[in-house]
Every structure is written in C-alpha cells, then in structure tokens.
Design a protein with these regions (language model features):
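Acyl-donor-binding surface of acyltransferase catalytic domains
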Residues: 1-21, 131-136, 142-201
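Acyl-donor binding region in acyl/amide transferases
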Residues: 84-165
C-alpha cells in the first residue's frame, strides 16, 4: 500500500514592497556551492543534484568575498482556479480587487519563486531573510513558496525567527504528505529529512 513517510511545509515568504539588497550576488559556478550543498543535503532522503547543479544561484557575500548564504530559485507561473478552504471560491474572485493583497496573489497570472538548496552560515535567520527579500526585489516578485521537510534542522532553526510576511499570517504553513508505495505493513518513516527539489513541486 501507500504510506506517509514524511511531512513537508508549504512555507510562504511574502513582501508587498520588497527591499533591494546590495549584498545579493549571482553565482554561476556549481563548484562554488557544491561543497556546502553536499555537506548539508547529501544525507537527505532522495537527494540528487541533477537540477540543483544547474546555475544560476543567488547568494550573499561579505566584504571579504566569503559566501554567507545562497539558494537556487525557480520562477513559476500558475493559474489558480480555486483557492483552498470553504471561502476559496469567494476569495479567488475577490482577491484581484483587494489593494496590496493582489500584489501577492493574482489568480489569473500567479507568479512566484520556489527555492531549493537553501543555506545560510550558522543557520542565520537574518541572512536568510535578507536573501529571500533581496531576491524578490531583484526579480520584481512578491512571493516565495518554499517546500521543505518539517524535520529539516535548518528549517527548524530559522522557522520562528523569520518575518514570513502577510500571507503567512493569513494562511500559515500548509502541510504536504510525502507518500511512498511499500509492501511492508509497518510504518516506514524517513530517518533523515526529505530533499525537496523545486522542479518536483511545480
């Protein structure tokens, strides 16, 4: 049968007016980020680097050139037929007419960024906040959707320290089950977090 072996969070990061960061740099060399990616993600279940090894990446470097944070971002465009929940149909029709909120959610042309291989030195939440907001400003976007294992040590370290934005205040972080087909009748939970590649979620 099928077993739920892990749970992901659909974590939103939104800014109505994202602030530009002068510290954001574009990185085009997989070898520059590879050691940190493998150090932090290689032990994750389902880890593979077919997609995450393809630049560009966006990061933060200090004045000495040390890499302090980075992630890879995939630009996504969806059409939302119906929002979730009892009021979903109503919200889908009304959000385009609600000032400011319609910057973040545009049902007919819903654009956002999806990160993977998210990392910051010493699991620094302030660096991650700077990275996410700076990339939103750079890409002229207002929303990031980050799918990440709820048991991921990095996510657990930064979760309560990030200003996730107005959309998170409205809907929180939605859970997603990772389901695996198995012949065993026992629960087969993952012993390490699941590696989530952006391309698998969009």
């Amino acid at each position: 049968g099928f077993k739920t072996v892990a749970k992901l969070s659909t974590q939103t990061f939104s800014r109505l007016f994202p602030k530009k960061s002068n510290w954001i740099v574009e990185l085009n060399n997989w070898e520059e980020v590879k050691p940190k990616v493998e150090q932090n993600f290689k032990a994750h279940c389902y880890y593979f680097d077919v997609h995450c090894s393809k630049p560009p990446y966006y990061g933060i470097k200090d004045e000495g050139g040390e890499l302090l944070a980075f992630a890879r971002f995939t630009a996504v465009q969806w059409e939302i037929v119906r929002m979730p929940g009892k009021m979903g149909g109503f919200l889908t029709k009304t959000i385009p007419f609600i000032p400011f909120l319609n910057r973040i959610i545009r049902p007919k042309n819903h654009q956002f960024l999806v990160p993977d291989i998210v990392w910051s030195k010493n699991k620094d939440a302030q660096l991650l906040n700077e990275l996410f907001e700076g990339v939103l400003a750079l890409k002229n976007q207002h929303l990031i959707l980050w799918w990440v294992d709820q048991q991921d040590s990095y996510y657990k370290a930064v979760q309560s320290k990030i200003k996730w934005g107005i959309l998170h205040k409205m809907i929180g972080a939605s859970p997603v089950d990772v389901v695996q087909k198995t012949q065993s009748t026992t629960t087969n939970e993952m012993k390490t977090p699941v590696f989530v590649s952006a391309i698998d979620m969009v």
